[in-house]
Amino acid sequence: MSLLTEVETPTRNGWECKCSDSSDPLVIAASIIGILHLILWILDRLFFKCIYRRLKYGLKRGPSTEGVPESMREEYRQEQQNAVDVDDGHFVNIELE
């Protein structure tokens, strides 16, 4: 006898499990853990950028600029922007014939 015929049998309404002893606490706990794991995995995949950025940097927005002259603030902003700008000189264009 195959495993399929031992566990599941076709009925008029669809597939039904013969071993419907779902009152076992271990089965209930495993089902709850499985459902929670699936929900957390889906949320992780949907929001992974937000979640890991928050964990990495926390709620910090950057160093405090309180008491710093405006000219120094602008210089700092410019340095930060230059650090993230892409330098096209580092890329090599390869043309296939």
UniProtKB/Swiss-Prot annotation:
Keywords: Disulfide bond, Host cell membrane, Host membrane, Host-virus interaction, Hydrogen ion transport, Inhibition of host autophagy by virus, Ion channel, Ion transport, Lipoprotein, Membrane, Palmitate, Phosphoprotein, Signal-anchor, Transmembrane, Transmembrane helix, Transport, Viral ion channel, Virion. The record marks 37 as: Essential for channel activity, possibly by being protonated during channel activation, and by forming the channel gate and the selective filter. The M2 protein from most influenza A strains is inhibited by amantadine and rimantadine, resulting in viral uncoating incapacity. Emergence of amantadine-resistant variants is usually rapid. Residues 44-97 are intravirion. Residues 1-22 are virion surface. The modification Phosphoserine is found at residue 64. GO terms for biological process: protein complex oligomerization; symbiont genome entry into host cell via pore formation in plasma membrane; symbiont-mediated suppression of host autophagy. The record marks 41 as: Seems to be involved in pH gating. The chain crosses the membrane at residues 23-43. It is a single-pass type III membrane protein. Residues 61-80 are annotated as: Disordered. It is found in: Virion membrane; Host apical cell membrane. Coiled coil: none annotated. Pfam families: Flu_M2 (PF00599). It comes from the Viruses. GO terms for cellular component: host cell plasma membrane; membrane; virion membrane. When the channel is activated, one or more imidazole moieties of His-37 probably become bi-protonated. HAMAP family: INFV_M2. Cytoplasmic tail plays an important role in virion assembly and morphogenesis. Belongs to the influenza viruses matrix protein M2 family. Homotetramer; composed of two disulfide-linked dimers held together by non-covalent interactions. May interact with matrix protein 1. This is Matrix protein 2. It comes from Influenza A virus (strain A/Duck/Hokkaido/8/1980 H3N8).
